[in-house]
Amino acid sequence: YYVRSQFNIADIVQHNLSNIELTAYVVALEINGMNIRETADLTMAMVETGDTITFDRGPIFDFHSVGGCPGNKITLIVVPIVAAAGLIIPKTSSRAISSAAGTADIIEVFADVNMDAHKLRTVAEKVGGTLAWGGSMSLSPADDTIIKVEYPLGIDPHAQLLASVMSKKKAAGANCLVIDIPTGAGTKVPTIEEAQAFARDFMDLGEKLGIEVRCAITYGEQPVG
């Protein structure tokens, strides 16, 4: 499956697929899903088609919220706290996928979120943390092309969500990752059982990629902040 994923992702990055073909790919993922081994292969294919960052010191920490909860601004609080503790957290975020605004859109209200991989590393090593749009650099470049199809469809396939998050973290050099999974009516993960399954998948995928993952299942039935 790894070789097939390489060809699929290479076609996406090189823009060899029409919007109709790419839509069919995303819908197929939504309907059929993938097991963890297939998701790990997809994730590594996404990493290898873009740039990667290596830091001179570690460990490298990161944080991600699955999203789907209105008003979620947790990242804007977590990153400064981690950086203030003397740790490195090179945080990249996406624009909106299934909501009105993604983390990168929110940060952009206050500051420029565009930086390349070299600048991300430089800033993270200098001040400890970054708040950047992942689409402005070539970390897992297939992801942003796929997101452009997911947004109008209003879907975020389980396997693609896992691969999207973990490919960006792997490419950014993360060793330790915390995943926030907002749960409840109106979120991407409506039940505690689904949240627990999501957490297991993230941790299993992290183990295959060499990233230590811890998950927090949080209440998401009301706006955050």
What kind of feature is each model-predicted range?
Residues A96-A111:
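Active-site-proximal loop->helix
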Residues P59-S99:
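Glycine/serine-rich anion-binding loops at beta->alpha junctions
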Residues I12, L29-G33, G67-G71, A96-I97, ...:
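Short, small-residue-enriched loops and turns at beta-alpha junctions
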